[in-house]
Amino acid sequence: MTFTISIVTATLNRRDFLPRCIESVAAQSYPEKEHVIIDGGSTDGTVQMLREYAAKYPHIRWISEPDDGLSQALNKGLALAMGDAVGVLGDDDYYLPGTLERVAAEWAAHPEAGLVSGGCDQVHNDGTLWVSLKACFTTRDDLIQCWRYWGQPVMLPAPSTFISRRALGKVGGFEERDRYAMDYRHWIKLTEHFSVRTVDQTLAVFRCGEGTISFSANRRQWAETLAASRDHWGRPLTRPWLRFFVSYLRFYQWQRVLNRLARLRR
């Protein structure tokens, strides 16, 4: 029985970044794959480029129509995806060779898992490495203290995390009220019901620099993460929320130090 992996990518006017993403999926040697691309109505030539890629690669399916933000676009992709597992890959991110084979092998060995996640390299726009992230979260308690590893690159990286069809059927898609940290709220809901398997392999590369969503929305991402923690773990001053908030503050202060050092190097 074949195990199909769907990749969902949402994009809007990102013609300069998107080819690397598309080619990284096409280059995967794992044959049972599909790439679902949701374009939000681009006007920069992306639509014509998608036509050309779809003609070249039969595993690509795509639509182009207006949407109300990234979460809604991703949910359209999840609804179209037909795989046994789904990965969400940003239009400015890309997979490393052998990623889909490794993910499929992990699910073959552990079919009960709801999520499979691996490492992710975070790079600047010029491709130089900033930090290597490891996937280590396996329980909901880990997510409560997701910032506790301040100063250490340890988390559940979104580009290198895959979700089973069974898990998506249980919890549904992304909350469309979230614009920047929709994946974190999704992790909380998923880990209420399913286990996470982590693999000791770098699966994806996450671009973080000027022009990327993460670069321009860091503070808003953190604000949404705090809101998700409050919604799921109760009002401030409850023990789980305090554990989350203290670890978050430590991480935030560490990020400020890193940003200051980066400015001094310029």
What are these regions (language model features)?
Residues E65-A81:
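Glycine-rich, basic loop-to-helix element that forms the pyrophosphate-binding segment
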